[in-house]
């Protein structure tokens, strides 16, 4: 039997992304976003939800571009800080020692220290209530070469992406692999 929790915001896993954008004056800013994920494969798109009062919201609307930076678990304190203060009054890059790099693909910065970066042009905007969902068309993905496996493919365990546990309000990391996708299910008769 399941206990009814009501309409709470709880899904697992949740990412702990850093979303980066330039404001109208060209100042680079980052914010922490746990509400996001891939939402389309063709064209490749990612969605992030941002409160309208957030500094980054205004920047994405103004520049029509943003990056989604996937931090490693080792960067948890910096990611937490980026979600605690507003870019309106704090230069989060200077405060954390992170490096803003201008994308060559979109009008947005990315965090150089993050092992994986998705560079996005604003594709769609959906007003949901407390949050606006921004859908970004992924124009480029950058990955640190040390996060590639022997075959040259991205390795999630080398990236060691930071995750957010919204139920416990804590950060965590990915566990062990369980088996190959589109293979485990064969035991049921395929």
Predicted features along the sequence, with ranges:
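Basic, polyanion-binding surface patches
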Residues: 1-190
């Amino acid at each position: 039997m399941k206990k009814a929790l009501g309409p709470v915001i709880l899904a697992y896993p949740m990412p702990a992304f850093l979303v980066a954008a330039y404001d109208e004056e060209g100042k680079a800013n980052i914010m922490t976003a746990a509400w996001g994920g891939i939402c389309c494969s063709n064209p490749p798109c990612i969605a992030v939800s941002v409160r309208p009062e957030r500094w980054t919201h205004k920047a994405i609307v103004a520049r029509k571009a943003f990056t989604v930076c996937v931090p490693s678990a080792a960067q948890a304190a910096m990611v937490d800080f980026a979600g605690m203060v507003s870019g309106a009054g704090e230069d989060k890059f200077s405060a954390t020692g992170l490096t803003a790099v201008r994308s060559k693909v979109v009008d947005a910065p990315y965090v150089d220290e993050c092992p994986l970066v998705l560079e996005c042009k604003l594709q769609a905007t959906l007003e949901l209530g407390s949050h606006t969902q921004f859908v970004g068309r992924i124009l480029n993905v950058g990955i640190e070469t040390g996060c590639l496996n022997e075959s040259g493919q991205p390795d999630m365990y080398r990236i060691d992406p930071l995750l957010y546990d919204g139920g416990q309000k804590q950060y965590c990391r990915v566990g062990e692999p369980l088996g190959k996708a589109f293979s485990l299910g064969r035991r049921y008769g395929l």
